[in-house]
Amino acid sequence: MLTLIVSVVLMAVYLIFMDPILTAFGATVNAETFALSREYCFWIALGIPFYMFGQAMNPIIRSDGSPRYAMLSLLAGAVCNIILDPIFIFPCGWGMMGAAVATVLGQIVTAVLAVWYLCRMKTVKPGKGDFRLHASLCTRMLTLGITSFLSQISLVAAMAAINNMLRKYGALDEIFSQEQYAQIPMAVVGIVMKFFQIVISIVVGMAAGCIPVVGYNMGAGKKTRVRELFTKLLLCEAIVGAVALVLAEGFPRQLIAVFGAANESSYYTDFAIKAFRTYLCMMVLACVNKACFIFLQAVGKAFSSTMLSMIREVVFGMGFTLLLPRFFGLDGVLYSMPVSDVLTFVIAAVMIVKTYRELNTEGATVL
């Protein structure tokens, strides 16, 4: 119930303050893309209640002993989105609206599957009284969720800073100050961030899968197993980062083509290649850092995890995004991520060593 209330409030906020929100994230009011942004945002805002409900129910379904159903419900929504996107955009000719509607319909599919499961839960049979809000429970939920909230909101703030710096310093660039090329920097970084998010989703999925195992073994006092799991997790995350790094550095043109931008101007292609190779050059460290954030939370160090995440996104991420362009222009925005990842890894490495020492029972070697 709390999720539905919050989602409706957020939907109203997005619909009422759509223009200021888009502007805050770097959209230019007078640009022809602004109308497309408004069109997309309108439909996405309408889908917020379905999206939030589906996402909120997913961990509940997993906790009820149905992880496969939880996965399939999300997968069904994603497949629906993938199938409907080209149909709505091209044969139907709906363009940007078609992409947004396809996304919302995918979210509705996930939400409907969640409702279906809610009526057939294994361990708990919800009654009408269970949907009432209780202050103590709401407070407890908000307390437990504040860590994830701060991490996500800091990431959003960092993304807003990146977009605004791209707009500001793109306007000062010899090429991108021209109207026909003005949208290239933001479009390119958007593609780079999509690729980055795909990789990070894999990283988060692997780390999140360790949480119940860590919780069980920590509760049983089997710290040696936790340490071994941490070692294997860091190794696997580093491998994922290395594969992503090879793709970004060695095959940027192919990645651009995958995202549907193969036939753009030479300025677009050149900047995209530079963006992939520069922005993602520390991908291995980015993956290890993300795994460290989640694992610290799993072993009960929620405060350390939150602080490390906020240092990465706010102090380093936003800080260098605002600072480096003053010296390097538009390229400074691209330098901000690798610099932030290196400095974050230095701090994370200290925490990793400390965590290993705390888990270093039975005389195992400290990393």
Model-derived regions: residue spans:
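Small-residue-rich hydrophobic transmembrane alpha-helices
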Residues: M1-A12, Y51-A70, M186-V246, G250-P252, ...
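Short alpha-helical transmembrane segments in multi-pass integral membrane proteins
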Residues: M1-G47, P91-I146, V214-M282, L324-L367
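Alpha-helical transmembrane segments of multipass membrane proteins
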Residues: A12, A56-I60, V79-I87, V115, ...
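Hydrophobic/aromatic end-of-helix segments at the C-terminal termini of transmembrane alpha-helices
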Residues: I21, L84, A157-L166, G170, ...
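Juxtamembrane helix-boundary/capping and inter-helix hinge elements in multi-pass membrane proteins
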Residues: A27-E32, S63-P67, Y169-I175, Q180-I184, ...
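Short runs within selected transmembrane alpha-helices of multi-pass transporters and secretion channels
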Residues: W43-R62, A70-A78, A99-V112, V204-A207, ...
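Transmembrane helix-bundle signature of multi-pass secondary active exporters and lipid flippases
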Residues: G47-Y51, T139, I146-N217, E237-L245, ...
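Hydrophobic alpha-helical transmembrane segments of integral membrane proteins
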Residues: A70, A78, G95, A99, ...
